[in-house]
């Protein structure tokens, strides 16, 4: 009898964990990159080749610029030069 109760309890726990894992929405992984500070200087536009915005799960919003040399630089999305670069990159 004790064995049945133990096995049944274990099965209920496994089912609960599987249910939680399967019910998570696709793409709900934790953010892979968050910025905790912004660059203090404006990047030269010809250094920037791409950008992405950080996840809304991050503590502060940021635009991450990727440079020709493969560096990633965090920038404040409220700065006018950042908005200008994003607009320009979207057009190209």
Swiss-Prot record:
Cysteines engaged in disulfide bonds, as pairs: 34-58, 35-74
GO biological process: antimicrobial humoral immune response mediated by antimicrobial peptide; chemokine-mediated signaling pathway; eosinophil chemotaxis; inflammatory response; positive regulation of cell migration
InterPro entries: Chemokine_b/g/d, Chemokine_CC_CS, Chemokine_IL8-like_dom, Interleukin_8-like_sf
Keywords carried by this UniProt record: Chemotaxis, Cytokine, Disulfide bond, Inflammatory response, Secreted, Signal
Domain of life: Eukaryota
Tissues where this protein is expressed: Detected in B-cells.
GO molecular function: CCR chemokine receptor binding; chemokine activity
Signal peptide: 1-23
Keyword hit for Transmembrane helix: no
Subcellular location: Secreted
GO cellular component annotations of the record: extracellular space
Family in the record: Belongs to the intercrine beta (chemokine CC) family.
Oligomeric and partner information: Interacts with CCR5.
Job of this protein: Chemokine that induces chemotaxis of cells expressing CCR5 or CCR1. Inhibits HIV replication in peripheral blood monocytes that express CCR5.
Cited PANTHER family: C-C MOTIF CHEMOKINE 4-RELATED, SMALL INDUCIBLE CYTOKINE A
Protein name stated in the entry: C-C motif chemokine 4-like
Upper lineage: Eukaryota, Metazoa, Chordata, Craniata, Vertebrata
């Amino acid at each position: 009898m004790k064995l049945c109760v133990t096995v049944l309890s274990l099965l209920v726990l496994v089912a609960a964990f599987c249910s939680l894992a399967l019910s998570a929405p696709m793409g709900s992984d934790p953010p892979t990159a968050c910025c905790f500070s912004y660059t203090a200087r404006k990047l030269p536009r010809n250094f920037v080749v791409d950008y992405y915005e950080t996840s809304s799960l991050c503590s502060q919003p940021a635009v991450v610029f990727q440079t020709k040399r493969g560096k990633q630089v965090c920038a404040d999305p409220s700065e006018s030069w950042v908005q200008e670069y994003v607009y320009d990159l979207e057009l190209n």
